[in-house]
Swiss-Prot record:
<feature type="region of interest" description="Fusion peptide">
    <location>
        <begin position="137"/>
        <end position="157"/>
    </location>
</feature>
<keyword id="KW-0732">Signal</keyword>
<feature type="disulfide bond" description="Interchain (between F2 and F1 chains)">
    <location>
        <begin position="69"/>
        <end position="212"/>
    </location>
</feature>
<dbReference type="GO" id="GO:0098670">
    <property type="term" value="P:entry receptor-mediated virion attachment to host cell"/>
</dbReference>
<keyword id="KW-1168">Fusion of virus membrane with host membrane</keyword>
<dbReference type="InterPro" id="IPR013055">
    <property type="entry name" value="Tachy_Neuro_lke_CS"/>
</dbReference>
<dbReference type="GO" id="GO:0019031">
    <property type="term" value="C:viral envelope"/>
</dbReference>
<keyword id="KW-0175">Coiled coil</keyword>
<dbReference type="InterPro" id="IPR000776">
    <property type="entry name" value="Fusion_F0_Paramyxovir"/>
</dbReference>
<feature type="site" description="Cleavage; by host furin-like protease">
    <location>
        <begin position="136"/>
        <end position="137"/>
    </location>
</feature>
<keyword id="KW-1015">Disulfide bond</keyword>
<feature type="glycosylation site" description="N-linked (GlcNAc...) asparagine; by host">
    <location>
        <position position="500"/>
    </location>
</feature>
<keyword id="KW-1133">Transmembrane helix</keyword>
<dbReference type="GO" id="GO:0020002">
    <property type="term" value="C:host cell plasma membrane"/>
</dbReference>
<feature type="topological domain" description="Cytoplasmic">
    <location>
        <begin position="551"/>
        <end position="574"/>
    </location>
</feature>
<feature type="coiled-coil region">
    <location>
        <begin position="158"/>
        <end position="209"/>
    </location>
</feature>
<keyword id="KW-0945">Host-virus interaction</keyword>
Length: 574
């Protein structure tokens, strides 16, 4: 019997395991633009979350007497231990929902408090293993983000008097029903585990019989399996402060999740998309602890609604583009900062700057519009003409030429500068390419790894077509003397404006220097002219004086006849 039971357990585990088949992306094309050191990967289809679908999940609980058959039978002991774990799990869930005023104040403190709490809640979960813990508030955080706003709203309504009974009564004769809550919202409710009827009508009667013996170990195993789900749900809510993501198979099994997807008010194409990508759906879903009362545990499951599907998506990869002609330490660099996922959406483009928030399955891109920016379609011009006049492309600048590599969908961008050695290798042939200084690209065809210095990068092995678009690196158009550095959130227009300001300042400085030089030259000319005039005047005076003097010395004294006669007469008169 034990062997049969073990086979049953193995078969259940096998059936409930979700196996994903990894397929190669088809029709992926990649364009590398040498002028901007960027690459665009195309050929993807969208699956954009635009809304949430909330559903209430219930588990029927049972109030168990503490004194259950004091037999020494081994099977009964196992049952009693399992019942003790069950009781502790229920107590854990009840303590989770206590102290609501504290929850409201804690919700105001928000996500940092939640993160701090989760770090301190990863210790071994003793409460479900038979050791009673001190009562503490584990958290039912309200309003920690718009992502779970709709689920939290439904959870708050379930705390109102009569709401749980309304759900409980609706599920008396069925495992699934639509219930209209007091806030006017209709939600699909489902009962995934009925521990109450099983414990009250099947388990306890067997334990409390006249001889307190259980001859069949299968009874113990069956209860352990049913109880294990409750224990795991309690553990998840406990260590995650009442809100968990992704959605585990304990919260909803695959069959339950597929059934819920089928009941969602969406198109058949959307249902098909979600059903074929269950693991992605789980990653983007939440479960929110609600209430434990009236022998019912209720929690909200919040699933994504992909309102935009099958529109084209592309991913932009960027790497630093630097000059290579200048001396070490004097180079300038420019990097496009608009990297991320882009998807067409109703005449515009949804941009997801944090690419890691999007999940890729084959050639399907699952993104949350809550993490997106809406841009005009002209943003595509940045790939082919970064200096276009219709859209101001985003860049950052620096004067630090750091070598690095960016792995793309079907290749790698390599920014290699200075004395760094950069190579591409094949696992069988070794180094097949050595990169020179600058920005370059290599496809994954025949390439397994890219090495930049001491860092090794493994390229993706997806199939696709790569196109190398050559062009003059735009960084060469800029003058290092006026290039602005450390602009982390700028655009082409802003950088050009700063360059123009610098050039205008230089021109103004030159003009001022020129005007000063001209003034000095004029003054010097005047002074020189005056000096020359003075010297000329002096020279002229000297020349006139010398001329007069020389004429005076060279002219003989002429005596008149009277003077001569008088002299003669005088001489004769003696």
């Amino acid at each position: 019997m034990a062997t049969t039971a073990m086979r049953m357990i193995i078969s259940i585990i096998f059936i409930s395991t979700y196996v994903t088949h990894i397929t190669l992306c088809q029709n992926i094309t990649e364009e590398f633009y040498q002028s901007t050191c960027s690459a665009v990967s195309r050929g993807y289809l969208s699956a954009l979350r635009t809304g949430w679908y909330t559903s209430v999940v219930t588990i029927e609980l049972s109030k168990i007497q503490k004194n259950v058959c004091n037999s020494t039978d081994s099977n009964v002991k196992l049952i009693k231990q399992e019942l003790e774990r069950y009781n502790n799990a229920v107590v854990e869930l009840q303590s989770l929902m206590q102290n609501e005023p504290a929850s409201s104040s804690r919700a105001k403190r928000g996500i940092p408090e939640l993160i701090h709490y989760k770090r301190n809640s990863t210790k071994k979960f003793y409460g479900l293993m038979g050791k009673k813990r001190k009562r503490r508030f584990l958290g039912f955080l309200l309003g920690i983000g718009s992502a779970i706003a709709s689920g939290v709203a439904v959870s708050k309504v379930l705390h109102l008097e009569g709401e749980v009974n309304k759900i409980k009564n609706a599920l008396l004769s069925t495992n699934k029903a639509v219930v209209s809550l007091s806030n006017g919202v209709s939600v699909l409710t489902s009962k995934v585990l009925d521990l109450k009827n099983y414990i009250d009508k099947e388990l306890l009667p067997k334990v409390n019989n006249h001889d307190c013996k259980i001859s069949n170990i299968a009874t113990v195993i069956e209860f352990q399996q049913k109880n294990n789900r409750l224990l795991e749900i309690a553990r998840e809510f406990s260590v995650n402060a009442g809100i968990t993501t992704p959605l585990s198979t304990y919260m909803l099994t695959n069959s339950e999740l597929l059934s819920l997807i089928n009941d969602m008010p969406i198109t058949n194409d959307q249902k098909k998309l979600m059903s074929s990508n269950v693991q992605i759906v789980r990653q983007q879903s939440y479960s929110i602890m609600s209430v434990v009362k009236e022998e019912v545990m209720a929690y909200v499951v919040q699933l994504p609604i992909y309102g935009v599907i099958d529109t084209p998506c592309w991913k932009l990869h960027t790497s630093p583009l630097c000059t290579t002609d200048n001396k070490e330490g004097s180079n300038i660099c420019l990097t496009r900062t608009d990297r991320g996922w882009y998807c067409d959406n109703a005449g515009s483009v949804s941009f997801f700057p944090q690419a890691e928030t999007c999940k890729v399955q084959s050639n399907r891109v699952f993104c949350d519009t809550m993490n997106s920016l809406t841009l005009p379609t002209d943003v595509n011009l940045c790939n082919t003409d970064i200096f276009n006049a219709k859209y101001d492309c985003k860049i950052m600048t620096s004067k630090t030429d750091i070598s690095s590599s960016v792995i793309t969908s079907i290749g790698a961008i390599v920014s290699c500068y200075g004395k760094t050695k950069c190579t591409a290798s094949n696992k069988n042939r070794g180094i097949i390419k050595t990169f020179s200084n600058g920005c370059d690209y290599v496809s994954n065809r025949g390439v397994d790894t890219v090495s930049v210095g001491n860092t090794l990068y493994y390229v993706n092995k997806l199939e696709g077509k790569a196109l190398y678009i050559k062009g003059e690196p735009i960084i060469n158009y800029y003058d290092p003397l006026v290039f602005p550095s450390d602009e982390f959130d700028a655009s082409i227009a802003q950088v050009n404006a700063k360059i123009n300001q610098s050039l205008a300042f230089i021109r103004r400085s030159d003009e001022l220097l020129h005007s000063v030089d001209v003034g000095k030259s004029t003054t010097n000319v005047v002074i020189t002219t005056i000096i020359i005039v003075i010297v000329v005047v002096i020279l002229m005076l000297i020349a006139v004086g010398l001329l007069f003097y020389s004429k005076t010395r060279s002219t003989p004294i002429m005596l008149g006849k009277d003077q001569l006669s008088g002299i003669n007469n005088l001489s004769f008169s003696k």
